[in-house]
A protein has these predicted regions:
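P-loop NTP-binding cores centered on the Walker
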Residues: 1-12
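Tandem repeat scaffolds
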Residues: 8, 16, 21-166
């Protein structure tokens, strides 16, 4: 399916999108190509974006509550001010993503790669960072009220943290 057709289908709404992803056998093996898409402010609450290519996508202020983004490619995506409450981001690639002021309360970021992601001002309350790949500098000015447990590991000259909300 062409990138434009994928965008057009997503624009019809999450209900039709999720039905299409769930019921069409050919689609179940399909990784949606939304690379560089302008999804600014879009309501994608509970959408199935599993394994989607959202690299460099504009998701500013998008409603991604409870959205399934497992194993999605979100490298260099702009998610600033997005709402990701209870979003499923297990195994997602968020390297270089802008997560400034993003609400990640209760989100599952286990096994996610967040190296180089900007989490300044992010709300991380009850977010699961189990086995996530995050460096100290990536946490920046993330919500200081979020109790995080971190286990430092060394990989070359970079200090990596396995971070998990307490």
């Amino acid at each position: 399916m062409s990138r434009q057709k994928t965008l057009d289908l997503l624009a019809t709404g999450k209900t039709l999108w999720n039905k299409w992803r769930r019921e069409d056998a050919e689609v179940q093996a399909f990784e949606p190509d939304l690379h560089g898409a302008d999804l600014h402010g879009m309501d994608l609450h509970e959408a199935d974006l599993t394994e989607a290519n959202l690299q460099e996508a504009d998701l500013r202020e998008a409603d991604l509550r409870e959205t399934d983004l497992r194993h999605a490619d979100l490298r260099s995506a702009n998610l600033s001010d997005a709402h990701l409450l209870r979003a499923r981001l297990h195994g997602a690639d968020l390297r270089g993503a802008n997560l400034c002021r993003t609400n990640l309360q209760g989100a599952d970021l286990s096994n996610a790669d967040l190296r180089g992601a900007d989490l300044d001002g992010a709300i991380l309350d009850k977010a699961n960072f189990d086995e996530a790949n995050v460096s100290r500098r990536d946490l920046g000015e993330a919500d200081p009220n979020t109790p995080l447990k971190a286990k430092e590991q060394r990989a070359g000259s970079v200090a990596l943290l396995d971070v998990k909300a307490a």
